[in-house]
Structures are given as structure tokens and as C-alpha cells.
Amino acid sequence: MSAPILTSAAFPAKQLKVGGVTAFSATDYPGKFAAVVFVQGCPWHCGYCHNPHLQKRTGHSPLAWSQVLAHLQRRVALIDAVVFSGGEPTMDPALAEAMRQVHALGFGVGLHSAGIYPRRLAEVLPLVDWVGIDVKASSPAYDGVTGSSDSARLALESAEAVLASGAAYEFRTTVHPALHTPEDILALAQTLRALGVRHYALQVFRATGCADEGLKATSTADYPGAELVAQVSGLFKTFTLRRE
């Protein structure tokens, strides 16, 4: 069951649990220069996660939101947008109010989410200018990747919410040969196309930050192969392959 919606009035932005900030990124929001705010906490345990240090939601926030906001105020006219990433940002009930404060500074708002909390995602989508949705696997393989039951259903609900919202988006999947067979990848792409997804990316597993030694040892830079990439590419209006 997805988490209940908790209003921003009850959770002011100062309560946002920030795990870190990247001052400048040209890759986290397509076509924009952005700062990235990393929010603590994620209930899923994907083996290929490159931010495992953010999975635990602690009582202490390494950075106060007031510090982050002051930093962003100094970046006005230097960057275009602020992306909330994680962890899973929608886990934090203070996210909506933090987004409003970012908008008030004149920045665009981006969001990276795995769609773990469909109702919370739906709450913040009206505040989002662009959202990147991490789709983990085809439905039968989903729980094996996330380490959590019922994860495919939650992801599907979130995908439907994003498509219904009208927000600019990208769906993307990080692939590893030990987790995703070519058949799985193609089946997932076909499912997304049938849902109405038009913008999709495949991202090759990155060893940087990953805590799973087995996945690091069995990764290969040439997976997926060119034939599969061509099949997937043809299903979408825009398609991106990220090998780095």
C-alpha cells in the first residue's frame, strides 16, 4: 500500500532531510543547468544503486534546508533548475513545500523518482516541471531488483500518474546482464510503449558507488547489444542510450 498523503502545512520545508547537494549538473535535467538536492531515505534496496548511503533515513540531516536555500539564492541566474533526487525524494513529506520555495526563487523544478509512493508523487507532480522516472524491470522481475514486494504495482501506478499529469518526463531503466535479460528489456520497453510512454532511456550499470561486489564483477560495458538497442529505440519518439 502506498503511503498516505501528508500535507505540506504539517511538514514545512525546514524539515526536509537533505543528504547532500551537487552545486552544478548538466546531466540531471535535460537541457538545463541544475543543482541537485539529494533527499535521505529509500525503502527499496536495488543492488546497482550508486547512492546506497542515502537509503537509510536518519534522524539527523547533514545539511539544514536553510543552508541549501541560502546556497540556491546565491545561484540565481547561474543555474536554471533544481532537481530533487535521492534516495527517494517522495518519501519526505516536506518535499512539496521545498519545491514551492525553489519555484519562488525562479528556478525550474526537476524530480528523480522510482515511483515508490504513487499518491505522494501525484501530490507533487503539479509542482514539477520535469520528472525522471526510474523503471526497474519487467513486472515479473521487479521485486527481485528492488528487494521489496508489490513494487511493480506501485511503479505502474506512478507511471500512469506521470503520464496523466502532462508534466515533461523521461522514463529510464538501468540495466545489468545479471538482472535484465534481453527478453526482459524488450518486454519492459513494449509495456511502457503500450502505456503511452514516448520518452525513454536505457542506462548501462555504473560501478561507481555500487556496494554489490558481484554486480561490479559481472558488469560489461557493451550490454545491451546493438540489435536490442535498435529494437527498443524504434518503440519511442525519443530514445537515449547512456553508457557512462
Task: Give the label of every model feature segment.
Residues 40, 85, 134:
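Short beta-strand segments
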Residues 11-17, 56-70:
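Non-heme iron-sulfur electron-transfer modules
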Residues 6, 27-63:
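Canonical Radical SAM [4Fe-4S] cluster-binding loop centered on the CxxxCxxC motif
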Residues 22-25, 53, 86-88, 115, ...:
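Short, well-ordered turn and helix-capping elements at secondary-structure junctions
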